[in-house]
Structures are given as structure tokens and as C-alpha cells.
Amino acid sequence: MYLSEIKLWNFRKYGIKDGVAFDKAAPALDVHFHNGVNVLIGENDSGKTTIIDAIRYVLHTKSGEPIYIDEKDFYKSKETNSQRTRQLKIECFFDGINDDDAALFLEWLGVKNTGDGKKNFILKVCLSAKRMDDGRIIPHFYAGIGGEGNSMSYEARNYLNVVYLKPLRDALQDMTHGYKSRLAQILQAHSVFSDSNKDSDGKHQLETDYNNLKAKVDGYFNKDGKQDGGKITKALNTTLTEKFLLQSDNKNAVIQLTGSELSDILRQLDLVMEDNKSGLGSLNLLCMAAELLLFSEKMRGLKLTLVEELEAHLHPQLQLRLIDYLESKGEYGQFILTTHSITLGSTIPLKKLLILKDEEVFPMDEDATCCTEFDYRFLQRFLDATKANLFFAKGLILVEGDAENLLIPTIAKIIGKDLHEYGVSIVNVGSTAYKRYVNIFRRKDKKHFNMPISIITDLDVRSIEYYEDPDNKGRKEVYRVTEETKKDLNAYKD
């Protein structure tokens, strides 16, 4: 089971066409995904986070952090004095539903014909919201193929929860003890700490062991006890009663381990890699490893992991190792990643990329581009990190070799048209295989990529080769062929 499509109406930057009634409007954005790894790639503010957040708003996350629609989620036109829209809607469609998954969502499923005589289950869930005059926002979640659908039970909706790794992760805070510890949320969502692993009294083994330890620690500091810790507690209470508290106050201070419930225990835990303080890169890997615990745990229902800015705090070699791991896990579930890393852009197979540009999403698979299978193979070999900046450019100049690569930026700067100021990238193809790169931007759906592309090559005139022959020893008689001499030659045919 995987997320195959998402549609947006009036969500953030994706607004429907003016003058069209909301209930009759086509979606402002329609994105198709495939099972396995999908990578949203594009420049800053191109809409990557908007798509990820839309998925989170509808499906919620496995860790259970609160997610609310606010006023700024409603589309606002860039025109002067425009107002935010009153309604928004997000629809998610799911495909690849097997019989086990179908049993979880039976009353909300639909059926579609595949064209080969077979039928597949499909599931649609929708989140809509209205913004009221008094500032309230009224959300409505429903599921089903036709019309407004039906409400979905809390239990069924939990099977659609996703694993989410947020951008610019504060890995140190997330993996450190505290009331808002992300590590505690992850552990509590793990099956090891589910109700099925508790005894008849509703106690987990960890709670029992912790409470035994707590009794010993608390006893050590008991003011009525005979251990050294009791002397400290007794001295504290003596100071309080004799120096600070009123005579009528009847209070005692104690030193103890706090909390006895499982949630309290998990909030006291840290995830560390080594005794010394780790760098941001190592902490980030720890954070992702912890988050992916939930991915491997979730056996039934949707297995979807959202990762924003996979490259955060990681050097290129670790980025490559991480993406290799995620690709290896792709057959067991779905990953939707965002990035603006040229390292990842050049490493991930082109078919798995979705380029975001100008309120549009351009899939790079064979159903969308004019690339042939040979083009894909060629680009997988030769589209390296120095060429992958074409995914982020406002304009593109493809050049044949090093000479053009050096001269063109210099000439542009001399005439006052610095290419960097205009977001124009130069890609040194290193050959005459321009068409393979251009086919990335040629679309079968005829959508315009809205990016000017130029191809600059040289004439490649061969230099005249000669050698000295003063004695004319190498002279050869050459018969010049013209229209007239052709007639003479034809006369000698047998």
C-alpha cells in the first residue's frame, strides 16, 4: 500500500483559478508518486515543504505530535489587497492495496479497472477546512471514493500515520531527556512498549524494574534512614523549618527519582553514540535511525516515511550511504524525500525525481519525459554533481567543453550580465550529447518547463595536416571527379 497521488486546492501557494467555484474547480496541484523512493527536488520556496505538510495534515504522524491547520495555510494571491481564501482541501489517494490492507479500510474502499481485465482496490481520504468570520477554522476529515465520503474511525486512521523527519532537526534536543523528548515519543510508539507487552496489572517490565530502583534511590535519601543520603535530606529540612518556613507550615522536602509511569521513565532517557559530545552529523544520523525504528515496526497499513532535507548536517559520503540504505528499503515501503543537494540530485536515479518549479511539479519518469531508456542509462552514468545544478536553475546553457565553460561566464560578466545574478547555470556536457540532457525538459504532457535553454558548441573545423616532401617522393596522381569526368568514368564500365 502506498500514496499514489495528492491533490491540493487553495493550500498555501497552490490556489485554484480565479472565477471558478470552489466545489467545481480543478486542483491547483496534482502530484503522482510511485512506490519506493520519491525525491522532491527544487530551489528554495519551490513548494517542497508545502507538499510534505499537506501529507502530514491529512495522515498525521506516527509519533503523534499535534498538527493543526492555521490561517496562513489558506491560499492568498500575490495581487495587491487580496484576501486569503475561505476554503481549502487536500485529497490523498492510495494504491497497491493487498487483501490484508483492504481488511483495515473495507468500508471506505473503491475499485478501479486496470485495463487488463483486473480490478484494484483504491482508497481516497480527504481533509477540508473552512475559515469562519470569527477566526475559527473548522476542519473536516472523511474517506471514500464518491461524494463527501464517510468519517473514518480513529483506529483505521492510525493505520495511515506516517513517519516524519522534520527539516533542520535539532537532533541533540530530540534525542535528549525532557518533557518534549522526541526519543520518548518514538519509544512509546514502538510495539515493545504496547499494551500487549504489559502484565495483568497493566505494568510493563521496565516500570517494574524502574520502581525497584526508585525505591532504593528514594530510600537512600530518606531522612529517617541511616544512610548518608538521609543526612543530606535531614539537613535540608532542618534549614527549611528553622530558617525559612513559618511555624504553621507542615512541609517536608524529599530527594527522589521523579515519575513512576512508563511515559515518565522514557522521558528520562538519552540516545548517545559515544561518551564525548557528538557532532551535528552523528547526532542527525542517530535521530534518523531512531525515527526509522517506527518504519520497520509498522507492518500493516501504510508504510510511508517523509524526510525533509535529507542532507542536513551530513557530508556527501554520508548522504550517499544514507540514500543507498533508503533505496534498499524501498521495496518494503515508500519514502518521500525533499532535497536541494546536487550530490543527491546526481546520485538518485532520474526516474525517481520530481522537479518543483513555478507552482508545478514535473515528474522525471518515462511516462512524463521524452527520455528514452538509453537516455536514462546515459544520464545515470554521466549526470554528476557538477551537472545536477540544472535542477535548480532559472536558465540553462549547455556547452560542449571546457573552453566554452570558461569563456561564457567571463564574457557575460564583461557585458554586465553576470550569470549568477540571473540564476543561469552552465552545464559542461563534455561531448555533443546535448539531446539526452534536453530530453529531461521535453514533456509528453506538453507542459512548459518555463526555463530558457541554450546549446553552445564550436565548429570543430579540422586543422590542415601536411608534411614536407622536397623530393616529391610521396606524390600521387589524383583524378579530380566532376560532373563532366563522371561521364568519362561511366564510359569505361564493362
Please place each PLM-identified region on the residue numbering.
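Switch/communication elements of ASCE P-loop NTPase nucleotide-binding domains
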Residues: 1-60, 264-388, 396, 405-406
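Extended helical coiled-coil dimerization/tether regions that scaffold
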Residues: 2, 174-178, 186-304, 328
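Conserved nucleotide-binding/hydrolysis micro-motifs of P-loop NTPases
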Residues: 13, 94-100, 131-134, 169-172, ...
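Conserved catalytic network of the ASCE P-loop NTPase/AAA+ motor domain
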Residues: 32-33, 43, 80-86, 116-120, ...
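Conserved P-loop NTP-binding catalytic core
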Residues: 52-116
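Short glycine-/polar-rich loops that comprise or flank the Walker A/P-loop
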Residues: 85-90, 121-125, 158-162, 301-302, ...
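Electropositive, glycine-dotted interaction segments
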Residues: 89-91, 97-208
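Acidic, divalent-metal-binding catalytic cores of TOPRIM
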Residues: 354-494
